[in-house]
Amino acid sequence: MKIYRVLVHLSFVLGMFTKTNTVLAWSKYDLVHGFMRVANISSIMRLDCLPNLLSSNAGYAALPSDDIPTGIFIKVNCSIPEFILWYEQKAMAAWINPIMGTVLMMNDVLKSGLENSVKVGLLTFLKRIAEKGPNGPLRNRGSGCINLIAPADISCYGSTRLDRFNRDFEDDSRGMPCRAKAMRRTTSGSRRANA
């Protein structure tokens, strides 16, 4: 009976991969959608949900830090659940890919030493979250840009614009890490700041 339950859970996890069609082709590092400065847990939970269009069309990138998060939060009241990593010492939160977040948490539950009844309950909860998630693939945005050592560094997008991850087209197309602002000439000959 125990082996049967494990096989059922494994088939569900594998079903998550086939449901999204492209998860198996993703890099395991492509997790982060965006960062935001937050003072505490209640600040995270009081934020409005991301708009559906932004959530379902979001790009995801690698975590720019090896820091271990202080907490993991799942906002299930949103139409597309939001997985949030909170870094207490840096007062930062990262919104991660909900498909990958669900799959990775399921994997951790399966590998844990928890009692079977607890595992079944957690996996049922995660399955419900997965069913609310986007059905299509989520695109990879490339490397993120945030200076976690100096989050007040205004040269990094995501730390100066706290408007829930709006990025310029140039930020995504270059795929470059944080860079200092520098003046550059436009085609009209005027100068403008380059973030």
Curated annotation (Swiss-Prot):
Residues 1-25 form the signal peptide. Disulfide bonds join 49-78, 156-178. Residues 28-157 are annotated as: Interaction with gH. The heterodimer glycoprotein H-glycoprotein L is required for the fusion of viral and plasma membranes leading to virus entry into the host cell. Acts as a functional inhibitor of gH and maintains gH in an inhibited form. Upon binding to host integrins, gL dissociates from gH leading to activation of the viral fusion glycoproteins gB and gH. The lineage of its organism: Viruses, Duplodnaviria, Heunggongvirae, Peploviricota, Herviviricetes. HAMAP family: HSV_GL_alphagamma. Belongs to the herpesviridae glycoprotein L (gL) family. Alphaherpesvirinae gL subfamily. Residues 28-195 form the gL alphaherpesvirus-type domain. It is a peripheral membrane protein. It comes from the Viruses. GO terms for biological process: fusion of virus membrane with host plasma membrane; symbiont entry into host cell. GO terms for cellular component: host cell Golgi apparatus; host cell plasma membrane; membrane; viral envelope; virion membrane. InterPro entries: Herpes_gL_C, Herpes_gL_N, Herpes_gL_N_sf, HSV_GL_alphagamma. Pfam families: GlyL_C, Herpes_UL1. It is found in: Virion membrane; Host cell membrane; Host Golgi apparatus, Host trans-Golgi network. This is Envelope glycoprotein L. The keyword Ligase does not apply. Keywords: Disulfide bond, Fusion of virus membrane with host cell membrane, Fusion of virus membrane with host membrane, Glycoprotein, Host cell membrane, Host Golgi apparatus, Host membrane, Membrane, Signal, Viral envelope protein, Viral penetration into host cytoplasm, Virion, Virus entry into host cell. Its main location: virion. Interacts with glycoprotein H (gH); this interaction is necessary for the correct processing and cell surface expression of gH. The heterodimer gH/gL seems to interact with gB trimers during fusion.
